[in-house]
Amino acid sequence: MAKRPLGLNKANKSKKKKLDSAEKAEKAVAKEISPENDESAEPAPALTLDADEEDDMGQLESLYKNWTSSERDSPRILHGVVHECDSLLQKAKGEGLPARFHEIYAASLLDLAEFADKKKPVKKKKVKSDDVAPETSDMFVDAALERVETGLEQYPEDAGLLFVKSRALKQDIDEKMSAVSKEERKETAKKMISQLNKILEVFKLAQKHASTVTPAQLDVVEELIELSGALESVVKQSDISETTLVACEKFYNEILASEKDENTVKKAHRGVGTCKMIVADSLLDLLDDDDEDNDDTVELAKKNLKAAIEHFQKSETDEDGEFMVTLAETMIQYGNLFETESDDQKKWYGEAVKRLRQAQRLGVGKYDEMILELEDD
């Protein structure tokens, strides 16, 4: 059996997000945060509003669509969306607003959090009564959670609201883990594990009530896999990511069994492939630690790698060079588990080389040295 990983970045591995240190998170704000603090000198983006001027929700939907179809590199449109939500809220006095209104409002607040500064670690100190706290990302997340809960009080089975809630709870974990001191980090991570389980339950409920699942909604599942690995590394509890992985793979497989949208299906295939790859990775680590390769471990690693490749190939596109590198890495690892110079090894190294050449043509990176090494083997 040949040497394992040949030097590529393991893009197929679940990336463990860095959990910064700081203080405990603030309590949820009582009111939604005003969007009118954007001091950017950028010109206002061109907007296309295709709804009747008398149709308030239609106007909001149209404005929000401008945001979701934009480059998302500036909060200007988002501020407009939130301002429109505030106006509708005042006009309706909180009554008669549809579930979609609350969904757009909460989702926009979560997106605004991405543009706000993170709450920085500070030592505990007395706060003067005239101190004004700057708007930080955790405040937007808290406001989004409050908004989505308001919507769910009226529409408890609305899938869109439930999907946004799962995303908000996930972002809340990120905020809390980035707002604790080094000393409190482990204890906070332990508390976040229960919230991780809650997110899985909320997503499961959303999936149950949804007529369809979008690729964007599936992002939460991918992020949960990454987050579980990060929490596991903090609390040193080995079953956190495994439990999450099983649940997430089940979500992906259920979507593959029922979803018709091509983009969602491709994303689900990548999700299953990622889950299989993570399992294989842990098995490869065991093989690296052992002086002699255990046949059962090798076969189990092969099984998971083969499954990962099959799912990855079903989601492969000619334009996604970065994913080609991920697939090539998986094929190399699979080829490494066969006898050196065997037909199987040559086959999978050859398939990997094809992807690396294409990725290089697309400008993803330089892989000439890796390609030469694979072709020499």
From Swiss-Prot:
Segments of this protein annotated with the region Disordered: 1-72
Main location: nucleus
Keywords: Nucleus, Transcription, Transcription regulation, Translation regulation
Compartment(s) of residence: Nucleus
Composition skew (Basic and acidic residues), residue ranges: 19-34
Keyword Plastid: no
GO BP terms in the entry: positive regulation of SREBP signaling pathway; regulation of translation
GO cellular component: nucleus
InterPro entries found in the cross-reference section: Nro1/ETT1
Keyword Coiled coil: no
Family: Belongs to the ETT1 family.
General function of this protein: Required for correct translation termination and probably involved in regulation of hypoxic gene expression.
Protein name per UniProt: Enhancer of translation termination 1
Lineage, broadest ranks: Eukaryota, Fungi, Dikarya, Ascomycota, Saccharomycotina
Name of encoding gene: ETT1
